[in-house]
From Swiss-Prot:
It comes from Pasteurella multocida (strain Pm70). It is an enzyme of class 2 (transferase). Keywords: ATP-binding, Magnesium, Nucleotide-binding, Transferase, tRNA processing. Its EC number is 2.5.1.75. InterPro entries: Dimethylallyltransferase, IPT, P-loop_NTPase. This is tRNA dimethylallyltransferase. The keyword Kinase does not apply. Residues 38-41, 162-166, 243-248, 276-283 are annotated as: Interaction with substrate tRNA. ATP binds at residues 13-20. One of its GO terms (biological process) is tRNA modification. One of its GO terms (molecular function) is tRNA dimethylallyltransferase activity. Substrate binds at residues 15-20. Pfam families: IPPT. Belongs to the IPP transferase family.
Length: 316
């Protein structure tokens, strides 16, 4: 009897679309274990502003790959792929189906397609580039990048120091340009993937949900959560954790950049922009994907159950 490729489920969608609620219901019905695919939920101490599942929700459906990093730590798509593959293998070994839930599309892409063989960050090289920038300015380093990697220089704004640094770092470490290395792909995913995306059919409903959820976060103590982070000397707005939507706006409010009402307005706008980017990415997704309606959760659940049952029968 030939070995069958194991099944995994992707449940994607924009922020505030109801992914967590649906995942919890699926966990009660199907032999699945949940893996979070969210670049904000990885951070400890960032619970309210990330809409992290509550203790009650996690008791019903434990999520792997949440609370695995301190906000000061870096975590890449490559880190996620390595961690997710380990968790998926562990779930399959237990006779269950991995259910990957979240809205960080870059993580899904890395998982499906593998990653180009880019070197890990090297603090010594990065520091040398920073020192060079202090002497010459980032515009001069952008010109240097244009000679090494014209394609990357076209994509990267001359003021985007972080991306200029990374592109130069890659060249200094490997002798090859970022553009050249990015064209090389890694290993594909050894799973049969059922891919679903959930969102309301009417975009205005999602906008309303985002506004209501942000207001609820404020009521739940989001400001106090960010104040604890703000008081830490090792955290700043250049860190990925502090650039998460909502956190940046609250941080800037605490710094005195604008008043409370403006912070709420900017936080809601930033979250809506994130949702728009997520939907745009999903609309352009090159893999087969079935769309589910956020306002018809029972129907969405039955659609996924039917797909899993069908594939299980075909593999048996």
């Amino acid at each position: 009897m030939p070995l069958t490729t194991p099944t995994a489920i992707f449940l994607m969608g924009p922020t505030a679309s109801g992914k967590t609620d649906l995942a919890i219901q699926l966990r009660q019905t199907l032999p699945v274990e949940v893996i979070s695919v969210d670049s904000a939920l990885i951070y400890r101490g960032m619970d309210i502003g990330t809409a992290k599942p509550s203790a009650e929700e996690l008791a019903l459906a434990p999520h792997r790959l949440i609370d695995i990093c301190d906000p000061a730590e870096s975590y890449s798509a490559a880190n996620f792929r390595q961690d997710a593959l380990r968790e998926m293998a562990d779930i399959i070994a237990a006779g269950k189906i991995p259910l990957l839930v979240g809205g960080t599309m870059l993580y899904y892409k890395a998982l499906l397609e593998g990653l180009s063989p880019l070197p890990s960050a090297d603090e010594k090289v990065r520091s040398e580039i920073e020192e060079k920038a202090q002497l010459q300015g980032w515009a001069a380093l952008h010109q240097e990048l244009a000679k090494i990697d014209p394609l990357a220089a076209q994509r990267i704004n001359p003021n985007d120091s972080q991306r200029i640094n990374r592109a130069l770092e890659v060249f200094y470490l490997t002798g090859k340009s970022l553009s050249e290395l990015s064209q090389q792909k890694g290993d594909s995913l050894p799973y049969q993937i059922l891919q679903f995306a959930i969102a309301p059919k009417d975009r205005s409903i999602l906008h309303d949900r985002i506004a209501l959820r942000f207001q609820k976060m404020i009521e739940q103590g989001f400001q106090q959560e960010v104040e604890k982070l703000y008081q830490r000397e090792d955290l700043h707005l250049d860190l990925p954790a502090m650039r998460c939507v909502g956190y940046r706006q609250m941080w800037e409010y605490l710094r005195g950049d604008y008043d409370h009402d403006e912070m709420i307005f900017r936080g809601i706008c930033a979250t809506r922009q994130l949702a728009k980017r997520q939907i745009t990415w999903l609309r352009g997704w090159k893999y087969p994907i079935e769309w589910l309606d956020s306002l018809a959760i029972e129907s969405a659940k039955q659609t996924i159950i039917h797909a899993v049952t069908k594939i299980s029968h075909s593999n048996s």
